Regions:
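Polybasic, low-complexity binding patches
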Residues: 39-57, 63-102, 237-247
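Charged, amphipathic alpha-helical linkers/stalks
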Residues: 70-157
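Histidine-centered nuclease catalytic patch
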Residues: 2-10, 20-70, 207-214, 226-231
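A broadly conserved sequence feature marking short terminus-proximal activation segments
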Residues: 1-3, 13-27, 149-203, 253-260
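Leucine-rich amphipathic alpha-helices with coiled-coil/heptad-repeat character
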Residues: 113, 117-120, 124, 192, ...
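Cys/His-rich short segments
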Residues: 196-240
Length: 280
């Protein structure tokens, strides 16, 4: 991961985020250019400037945590004590809990878009001012998407720390439980990301970019505003090309239900590991 041209949008991003880290809410000093960083969320374009809709403000500590996930494949196993491993797993579980909440909120917002935009169209037909409603909806969507994706990236980084633990210092039962916890947490991350991707399809079905929420032009596969490639909607269309929103919403709900089930399993397995660490 490199900073590339993220600097181009720093001022706008910091102003939008009230000069505070969107993960831990640490406030930066306006006079200190190193107090805050910009971090890209989602599948940003590989070349050119990253649009501010896909940039989140983070503090240096959170930026370093996020960097761990990208550096993890090259990292050496980390030796930790039973107490340190317990705290690490507990913190990872806490962070994932926050990610679940953020993803659920984003999914709820996304599934409300057809109704919201339909109401805007009705208001416009009646001669009422609808531009402010669209702007507010767009801002809420972008914020919700960034929050969900950032939370998932932070959870991924925490999970990489768990995976990087050198298990040879622990007995076989702890090693087995640790592996099971990491595997279950990874499954949870995949399910949550699936829910986000399916939620991102909703605005595309409404001819809006899933990143910046600006209108998509014609049959273009790439947004002319932020450069993101549009999500594929073919699987969510009926025989005559109409959008099958109910089926799409049902799939989003299925992903969230799956995440809930996996969370229950993860909680049980984490408690087992915690008990073993306490006894060791």
């Amino acid at each position: 991961m490199t900073s590339r041209d993220w600097q181009a949008d720093r001022c706008a991003v910091f102003d939008r985020d009230d000069h505070a880290c969107r993960n831990c809410e640490t406030t930066g000093d306006d006079a200190d250019s190193t107090a805050l960083r910009t971090y890209p969320v989602g599948a940003v374009p590989l070349e050119g400037t990253v649009h501010e809709s896909s940039l989140a403000t983070v503090c240096p500590d959170c930026f370093e945590t996020l960097q761990f996930a990208s550096d993890a494949p090259d990292s050496t196993p980390e030796s930790v004590s039973s107490e340190e491993l317990f705290r690490l797993v507990r913190e990872t579980t806490r962070v994932q809990g926050g990610a679940i909440s953020d993803v659920a909120s984003f999914a709820s917002l996304a599934t409300s878009l057809p109704t919201t935009l339909a109401a805007v169209g009705t208001a416009a037909d009646a001669g009422d001012d609808s531009e402010s409603t669209v702007a507010e909806t767009a801002a809420a969507y972008r914020d919700g998407r960034r929050e969900a994706l950032l939370a998932l990236d932070v959870a991924d980084a925490r999970l990489e720390r768990v995976r990087a633990v050198d298990g040879t210092a622990f007995d076989a039962d702890v090693r087995s439980s640790l592996s099971t916890v990491a595997e279950t947490a990874t499954d949870l991350q995949s399910t949550l990301r699936e829910a986000v991707v399916r939620s991102e399809i909703v605005p595309v079905c409404l001819e809006r970019c899933h990143g910046c929420f600006e209108p998509l032009e014609g049959e273009d596969e790439t947004c002319s505003t932020c450069g993101l490639e549009a999500r594929e909607t073919g699987d969510w269309r009926g025989g005559e090309g109409e959008i099958a929103f109910e089926r799409l919403f049902s799939s989003i709900n299925d992903s969230l239900q799956g995440a809930s089930t996996t969370t229950e399993t993860l909680t049980d397995r984490t408690m087992t590991l915690a008990s073993q660490l306490t006894e060791s």
